[in-house]
Each structure stands twice: as structure tokens, then as C-alpha cells.
């Protein structure tokens, strides 16, 4: 089946192309796109700072309606809404493998679960590492959406948390700091702008969550080696990421996590998709996260 898809090759823009969608496999569902979030990584890919990924991997913050179900899938039905991690979510229709989708009650941007799950997964992918440091001091570098979700997840445990950043001051209040004076047991790096171990002081056996793929300098490496640090890199391709998606759904549905204020702008797929990526790049006043809507 040939369908439309939005693609970037890293030349500063997205374009509409034709995508050949295969028949869904026995362990897949077919979905029709309803909403897809514009991720910062898509903007980085557009500007040439990342990738570009092949066409079949473009768009990953999906919400769709099921149109067909493989014979090995038994927990959903045709016509049901699902949040997807599968790709390409910028296509009009796409297939999603089992354990890469979660049924949701309605087509509302709060149920674009993949980016929420990314924030939760910063903690849950290596939960045992956090648990062995319970009661320690945590630094989150960055004050955007992922930082806020990660901070919310940390409320399930007992940590002293600082958030280092300059954005969303009204959201964070006194929890937001502009410089650090403490030594930390855990650092969650969503920025890549600081030297972890030199600019940011660490305690022995510290845990570093590198969420940006930062290049480590020699000075950092020496300090991290001296302090016997552990570094992990969370990924939505981890086998347990689906658990973070379920956690995101449950927190949102139960009212324990309010993400509505972050989804600030919707864009019509037929007439406004180019503006969606332009605003993702320029981030006009009041913009937090945008999403594309199919009729």
C-alpha cells in the first residue's frame, strides 16, 4: 500500500514523499495516524545535527486508530485508539509491532505517550541503580518536558533533587537552580553542556544518566574513573520501554501526571505540517510541544 509520509534528509526541511507500507505481520497491528508529536530529535535531524534516519523510521510519537490486527495480537480490537512507539508515525498509515503500542481511551494529545515514557524511562530503565542510591542527591540538567516528567517519576522514591536550567521558571519555582554547589550521587544529563565530574562534582559510586550521547572529555573521564562512576544511556528501544508507556498511561489516566499544558500547538496534516516543523525549530513565544493532526 502506498501512503503519504513526511521525511527529512537533513537539509533544513521536511517534505512529503510516498511510503510503501507492507502488509501487517502476524505480530503487528496496522494503524491510521490520528496525531503525531514533533520531537526535538526530528528537528535536530532536519537541521543536520542527527541522522538522518531512513524513511521507515521517521516519526515516533504516534497516536493512531487500529485498522487491522495480526493473528498473534489479542489484546486490542479494530477501531481502538493506541499510542505507538512504532514508526514511521509521520505516515498516513503504518504498522506497529507487539510491545510497541498501548491502548488509550481517546484521541487526545495527552495520550501521545512516547515522549512521556521517555521521561519515565530515564529512571525505570535502570531502576535498580536508583534504588541502591535511595536517599542520595540527584541533579537533573535541563528544565524542559523530559526533566519535568523525570522529576515526577522521582517522587515515587526518596531523593533530594535539584534541577539546573534556565527555562520554564514558572513551572519549577524554587526547585530550579542556576548553579551547583553540591556533590551528586546521580546526574541526569538532558543538556550535554556541562562537564560531568569537573563542572558538576560527583560523589563516589555516582550514577550518570547520559540522555544526549555526550562526548566525554579526558578530564571528565579521569574524574569519573576516580569516583568509580556508572554511566548508562537510556533508549526507547530498550526491551522494557513498553512498561514506561504503560506507566505513562496509568499516571495520566489517574490524574497523577498532567501533561496537557505542554501540548501547546496542533497543526493540520494537510495544510499546516510545514509550519509544525518551522515552529519546532524557532520555538515561538508560548510554544512547548507541537503535534500534527490527521482529519
Predicted regions and their residues:
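Glycine-rich phosphate-binding loop and adjacent beta-alpha segment
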Residues: 191-254, 295
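Hydrophobic/small residue at the entry helix of a nucleotide-binding pocket
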Residues: 118, 145-146
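Glycine-rich beta-strand-centered segment in the early N-terminal region that forms part
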Residues: 20-37, 47-88
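C-terminal hydrophobic helical "lid"/dimerization subdomain
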Residues: 242-295
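Short glycine-/small-residue-rich Rossmann-like dinucleotide-binding loops
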Residues: 37, 44, 70, 191-192, ...
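NAD(P)H dinucleotide-binding glycine-rich loop of Rossmann-like/cofactor-binding domains
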Residues: 81-140
Amino acid at each position: 500500500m502506498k501512503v503519504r509520509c513526511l521525511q527529512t534528509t537533513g537539509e533544513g526541511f521536511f517534505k512529503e514523499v510516498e511510503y510503501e507500507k507492507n502488509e501487517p505481520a502476524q505480530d503487528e497491528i496496522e494503524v491510521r495516524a490520528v496525531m503525531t508529536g514533533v520531537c526535538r530529535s526530528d528537528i535536530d535531524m532536519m537541521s543536520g545535527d542527527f541522522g538522518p534516519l531512513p524513511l521507515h523510521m521517521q516519526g515516533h510519537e504516534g497516536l493512531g486508530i487500529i485498522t487491522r490486527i495480526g493473528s498473534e495480537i489479542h489484546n486490542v480490537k479494530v477501531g481502538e485508539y493506541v499510542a505507538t512507539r512504532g514508526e514511521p508515525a509521520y505516515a498516513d498509515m503504518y504498522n506497529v509491532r507487539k510491545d510497541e503500542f498501548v491502548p488509550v481511551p481517546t484521541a487526545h494529545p495527552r495520550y501521545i505517550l512516547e515522549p512521556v515514557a521517555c521521561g519515565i524511562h530515564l529512571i525505570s530503565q535502570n531502576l535498580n541503580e536508583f534504588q541502591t542510591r535511595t536517599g542520595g542527591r540527584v541533579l537533573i540538567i535541563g528544565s524542559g518536558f523530559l526533566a519535568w516528567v523525570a522529576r515526577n517519576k522521582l517522587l515515587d522514591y526518596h531523593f533530594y533533587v535539584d534541577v539546573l536550567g534556565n527555562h520554564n521558571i514558572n513551572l519549577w519555582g524554587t526547585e530550579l537552580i542556576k548553579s551547583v554547589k553540591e556533590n551528586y550521587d546521580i546526574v541526569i544529563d538532558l543538556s550535554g553542556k556541562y562537564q560531568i565530574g569537573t563542572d558538576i562534582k560527583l560523589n563516589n559510586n555516582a550514577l550518570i544518566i547520559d540522555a544526549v550521547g555526550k562526548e566525554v572529555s579526558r578530564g571528565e573521564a579521569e574524574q569519573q574513573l576516580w569516583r568509580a562512576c556508572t554511566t548508562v544511556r537510556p533508549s526507547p528501544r530498550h526491551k522494557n520501554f513498553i512498561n514506561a508507556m504503560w506507566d505513562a498511561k496509568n499516571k495520566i489516566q489517574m490524574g497523577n501526571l498532567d501533561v496537557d499544558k505542554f501540548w501547546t500547538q496542533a497543526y493540520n496534516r494537510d495544510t499546516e505540517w510545514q509550519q509544525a516543523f518551522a515552529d519546532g525549530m524557532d520555538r515561538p513565544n508560548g510554544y512547548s510541544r507541537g503535534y500534527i493532526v490527521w482529519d
